Structures are given as C-alpha cells and as structure tokens.
Amino acid sequence: TGLAALKWNGLDVSFIRKVEKGREGWLFLKEEVAGRNELLQSLGIRPYRDIERKLWNLLIVQRAAWAKTQGIQYVMVIVPNKASIYPEFLPARYHSADSSRALPDPPGVPIVNLTADLIRQKSIGQLYHKNDTHWNELGAFIGYQSLMRALPPPFQEAPLPLDSMQVQWVTEPGGDLARLLLMDSVLMEKAARVSVRHPQARCEISCDAPFGPWMSPKHFRNPHARLPKVFFDHDSFFKSVAPFVAEHFQETIFSWIWQGFHQDMIEATHPALVVDEFVERSLIGDRPRNVP
C-alpha cells in the first residue's frame, strides 16, 4: 500500500512491529507471537527459562523413548532462524549477547543442528530469502546434505552433489515478511530453484493435494533406494527438502505440523526412522505439545 511504501522508503521503518527492516533490503521476523522473539533468541539475548528447557527436554525424550518401544529410531532436527545465519544484515543496534542460544538438549537423543553447515556454506550463494522467514531452495539443499551426513547409522548416506541438480535463479514476488508489510508485489527478489536432474523417487499418495499444515501426508517411493522407510514430522521448512531426501529412502512420508508428533500415523505406517524437525524459533515461547 501507499502508507507501507512511505514508511519503508521515507521513514526507514517497517509497517508492522512483527517485521524488522535490516540492511541491504533484508527483512527479519521479530516477535511472531507473545514470548517468541526470533531476533532475541538468535542473538542469545533471550535464554531459556529452566522450566522451558525441562519441558522441551522431557517431551523430546518421551518421543524418542516411545519410538524405541516401537523399534523405531528417533532423530531431532533443528533448522536455524534466518537471523542465526545472517546476523550481519540486522540493523546496527542489534548485538549478540554472551549467553548461548536457547535450544533444547535432551539427554540421550540424537540431535542434528543444521546451523554450522549452513554458516560454512554461505559462500556458495544466498541461502535464505531476503523478504521471507524461510531458506530458499539452495539453503534447503544444503540443509538436506547436512542431514544425510549426520543421520545415525544405518541411515547415514552420502548426499547428492550440487552438480547433480538443476539450479535456476528466478525473480518472484516477496515472501511472508513482505506480505505482512503489504508489499509483496513491490519487494521482488531473485530466488533459487533447485531440482533433481534425474529423480528416481515418485510421489504416490496425496500428490495433488496442497503441501501444507494439517493436510494429508505425502508419500514418496523409490524402489532403487537402499534406506528403509522414514517418517518426517516437519514444519514449513521441509517442504522444499522433500524432493531431495526422498531420493534416499524406499518410502518417505512427510507430515507437516507445527511442533506436533503424529504418534498414530507413525504407529500405523511403522517406519524404521522418524525425523522430528523444528525451526529454531518454534522451540521457545510456547508449551510443547503432541498430537494424538
């Protein structure tokens, strides 16, 4: 809108308090809901309260213990906030604190934190959208590579190399942060499009349904894969990871839900591995929960 553009261009501030205007056209999410501030978390300014850490650790340990009783390996995966990867584009008034970032540390549970690999790979290209909270498809590909290297045996496997992908950069409308500002048609950006050149995995169930929260899980099959069935409980970040990881498993099930754990679906499909993925900011400011 005109008012949004005026505040953006003339006053150098964003239209709403949820969005922080960074340097060089970058946008960042601030407080998504009360108590969940991504910037304070990524900068280490907002450490965990003891009760929060205990609740999250208990929940994750319970999920892993239940999976073990079913003969299923459980792995927790953490996708970093954009501000954790690109703090250099935050406004100059933001500074990191000495305290460590707020993340659970459940004892005895395998955790794959993708942050370090994404930071190391920033030189290959932009990994997150400037005006969206999410990584772009190049960032998703780097996250996929990191995950496949870090999974516990016998699920670990060498990831596909980048040169086996088709990579294009396309101009597209602004993402979720630009939409919050009512400026998605103004704040255009180039975004990576990454696809497997010769895919072997095929979607077989819910292929035409929208890929979104609370939708029917999507099932992929690859008869040429070595690894057994896997179930991904994930959020919006793994929508773009799905085509890559599906290449490695005989059957891959993707169920999109915020913080949730589809125990009934997991029990019914009985995978060998459950990957429970969380974006970093989802691990604070809310009571963790399971979905029956």
Positions of predicted regions on the chain:
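Extracellular glycan-modifying ectodomains
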Residues: T1-P292
